[in-house]
C-alpha cells in the first residue's frame, strides 16, 4: 500500500533531498526533506508536519555496544560514509527524550557517545542528553569536537582521528 505522501505533489519539497524515516518496525512514519542550498528556509521539512521523529536509523540491532549520537541526518551520513557505521541521528537537539534512549537500551546498546555540534547550543544539549542517557542506564560521554565544528563537515582524516579518540583505550 502506498504511503499518502506519494499521492500528491508538494512544491515545498522541490530542491530537497528527501529521506524516508522508518520506525523500529520498518514502517515509514515520515519524510525528512533537506534543502540543498544554505539560503532556503526552512532548511528541513518534515512530512507529515506533526510526525514524531524516531532516532534514525531506529533499528540498531546490528550495532554492538555503543552508538554515536549526532544531531542531523547529514552528520550521520558523513560518519557512516567514512566508516563509523554506528552513528545515529536524533533530528535536532530538541527531539531527544528518555523514551527514545530507552529503545536503544532495549536493543542491547549499552553506551552513547554524544557528538553534537561544537557550538554552545550543541554542547549544552549534549550535557542534557548525557543526563537523560544515564537515567535510562546508558553509559554516556560528551565528545566535544571543538568550537563550531560540525560532524557533518568532518573530512576523512578528522573522522579517522575521531574513531581513534572513541575506540582506542
Over which residues does each language-model region extend?
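Phosphate-handling DNA/RNA-contact segment within nucleic-acid enzymes
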Residues: 1-108, 124-126
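C-terminal or mid-to-C-terminal helical accessory/interaction module adjacent to the motor/catalytic core
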Residues: 142, 147-148, 154-169
Amino acid at each position: 500500500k502506498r504511503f499518502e505522501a506519494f499521492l500528491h505533489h508538494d512544491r515545498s519539497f522541490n530542491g530537497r533531498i528527501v529521506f524516508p524515516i522508518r520506525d523500529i518496525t520498518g514502517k515509514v512514519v515520515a519524510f525528512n526533506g533537506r534543502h540543498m542550498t544554505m539560503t532556503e528556509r526552512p532548511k528541513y521539512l518534515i512530512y507529515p508536519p506533526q510526525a514524531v521523529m524516531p532516532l534514525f536509523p531506529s533499528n540498531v540491532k546490528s550495532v554492538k555496544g555503543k552508538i554515536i549520537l549526532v544531531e542531523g541526518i547529514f552528520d550521520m551520513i558523513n560518519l557512516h560514509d567514512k566508516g563509523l557505521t554506528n552513528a545515529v541521528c536524533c533530528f535536532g537537539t530538541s527531539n531527544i527524550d528518555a523514551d527514545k534512549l530507552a529503545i536503544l537500551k532495549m536493543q542491547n546498546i549499552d553506551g552513547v557517545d554524544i557528538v553534537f555540534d561544537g557550538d554552545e547550543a550543541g554542547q549544552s544539549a549534549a550535557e542534557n542528553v548525557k543526563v537523560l542517557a544515564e537515567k535510562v542506564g546508558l553509559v554516556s560521554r560528551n565528545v566535544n569536537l571543538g568550537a563550531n565544528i560540525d560532524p557533518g563537515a568532518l573530512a576523512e582524516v578528522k573522522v579517522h582521528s575521531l574513531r581513534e579518540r572513541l575506540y582506542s583505550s
